[in-house]
């Protein structure tokens, strides 16, 4: 036991106490309320006794300036559950949307009351779902479709549960592996058909903000809880690191394991892997280009290769583990805003660097993507690069910011260097419905013309786009003269 005089306080800036902030996804695990400010609706990011932070995943129609006092309204299923006035105290632009922090002016958050009103609003919405004005915005065809999806999924769950009960009466144990393998092929086939239908239906609501938000709320209430039985769906929806598509989700795709406590959970996870398969296939394309660059440019000096938004950098790890890595010298630079991702990449790649005896070096930059856009940003710290790639970042950006980033990366290329940009492809079986509506994972889907436009006016030797094996990711290649 410590004596009273041995008890310690905080140091530095932490001596200024602030009320505890709660992650909105944890405080409201089923469906966090939206925050209405002026004419725009925002995602609640975190909340404390005296303030909130929100995220705008699409460009806001309203301009918010630091110091401005505005009215804020929390809405659950279209019903108001909290109202107050707040001062804008911070704004931040990230690849995943704009963040705004507000300090309440003449009120505070009564958490007991807020949670109670949130539940009441959800119950009221459930009780009047078909007649409520907001939920009338959800297409009738989509309601029936979600029922069909649940019917398919729960038929597998019921079948597995029944067989598990039957085997409990016999001395033989339930064959979990056999049950998984018996269901997997047929279930994935049915899922892909439903996925295609879902895409067709939700494209009709994408042009209307109100209809899109209402349809997403319906999905998150009806379908998302079922899908969260799968590990990759749960992490994608909950976003425990505060943003979508974190490096652990990438790892789940690369590892392609049967995650889950039972066969049904493993199968739902498998459906999520089917959607995210393009993360792995785009990685294989990049790994091939790394090998080409090292072979062509890494003989007399190290080929310089930079990855923006590197995440776990599995393409580099697997390249270094292959015989191709002995074909030349290389110097890799990993850039990511998440130190944990860089730490894991370093831990996994460093043993291979030792084995290669100095042929390959690696640097890591923990800087924000916004810094990259600045003239005197992080790219000034590295020499001109023979290859730069960013395959999981620009689909979070508006077209204007994406164009600026492409130009900034192109400037950082050495003569003859190659820039590779990946973006989710606009195609019939795109990831639109499963990611945007089930997992609340907002991306910009683009076609050949939209991506090629980013290269216009750069003075490139050549530029073109390709898609990887699944056709769900489009890659823009720009070669500098």
Q: Where is each model-derived feature located?
A:
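N-terminal helix initiation/capping motif
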Residues: 1-49, 57, 119-136
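Short conserved beta-strand and strand-loop elements enriched in small hydrophobics
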Residues: 28-37, 64-81
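Short, solvent-exposed secondary-structure boundary/capping segments
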Residues: 52-56, 92-106
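Class I (Rossmann-like) S-adenosyl-L-methionine-dependent methyltransferase catalytic domain
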Residues: 67, 127, 150, 154-201, ...
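N-terminal accessory segments
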Residues: 86, 110-263, 289, 293
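Conserved class I S-adenosyl-L-methionine
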Residues: 300-311
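A short acidic, Gly/Pro-enriched loop at the edge of an enzyme's catalytic core
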Residues: 375-388
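A short SAM/SAH-binding and catalytic strip from SAM-dependent methyltransferases
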Residues: 385-400
């Amino acid at each position: 036991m410590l004596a009273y005089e041995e008890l310690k306080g905080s140091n530095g800036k932490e001596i200024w106490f602030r009320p505890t902030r709660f992650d909105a996804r944890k405080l409201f695990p089923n469906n966090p309320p939206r925050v209405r400010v002026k004419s725009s609706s925002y995602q609640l990011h975190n909340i404390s006794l005296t303030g909130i932070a929100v995220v705008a995943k699409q460009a806001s129609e309203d301009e918010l300036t630091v110091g401005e006092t505005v009215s804020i309204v929390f809405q659950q299923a279209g019903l108001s559950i909290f109202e107050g006035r707040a001062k804008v105290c911070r704004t931040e632009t990230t690849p995943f949307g704009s963040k705004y922090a507000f300090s309440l002016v003449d009120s505070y958050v009564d958490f007991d009351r807020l949670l109670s009103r949130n539940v009441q609003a959800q119950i009221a919405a459930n009780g009047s779902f078909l007649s409520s004005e907001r939920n009338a915005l959800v297409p009738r065809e989509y309601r029936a479709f979600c029922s069909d999806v649940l019917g398919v999924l729960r038929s597998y769950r019921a079948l597995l549960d029944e067989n598990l009960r039957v085997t409990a009466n016999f001395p033989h144990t339930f064959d979990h592996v056999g049950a998984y393998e018996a269901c997997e092929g047929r279930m994935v086939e049915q899922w892909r058909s439903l996925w295609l239908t879902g895409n067709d239906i939700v494209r009709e609501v994408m042009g209307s903000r109100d209809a899109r938000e209402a349809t997403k709320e319906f999905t998150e209430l009806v379908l998302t809880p079922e899908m969260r039985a799968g590990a990759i769906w749960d992490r994608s929806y909950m976003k425990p690191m505060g943003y979508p598509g974190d490096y652990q989700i990438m790892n789940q795709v690369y590892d392609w394991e049967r995650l889950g406590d039972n066969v049904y959970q493993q199968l739902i996870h498998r459906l999520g892997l089917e959607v995210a398969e393009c993360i792995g296939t785009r990685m294989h394309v990049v790994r091939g280009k790394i090998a080409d660059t090292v072979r062509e440019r890494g003989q007399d000096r190290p080929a310089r290769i930079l990855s923006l938004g590197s995440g776990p950098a599995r393409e580099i790890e697997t390249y270094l583990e292959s015989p191709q890595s002995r074909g030349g010298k290389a110097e890799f630079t990993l850039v990511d805003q998440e130190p944990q991702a860089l730490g894991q990449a370093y831990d996994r790649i460093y043993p291979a660097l030792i084995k290669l005896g100095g042929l390959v070096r690696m640097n890591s930059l923990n800087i924000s993507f916004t810094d990259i856009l600045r003239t005197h940003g992080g790219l000034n710290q590295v020499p001109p690069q023979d290859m730069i790639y960013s395959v999981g970042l620009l689909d979070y950006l508006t077209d204007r910011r994406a164009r600026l980033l492409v130009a900034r990366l192109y400037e950082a290329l050495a003569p003859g260097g190659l820039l590779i940009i990946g973006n989710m492809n606009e195609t019939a079986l795109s990831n639109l419905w499963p990611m945007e509506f089930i997992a609340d994972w907002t991306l910009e889907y683009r076609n050949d013309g939209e991506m090629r436009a980013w290269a216009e006016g750069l003075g490139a030797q050549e530029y073109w786009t390709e898609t990887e094996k699944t056709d769900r990711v489009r890659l823009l290649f720009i070669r500098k003269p």
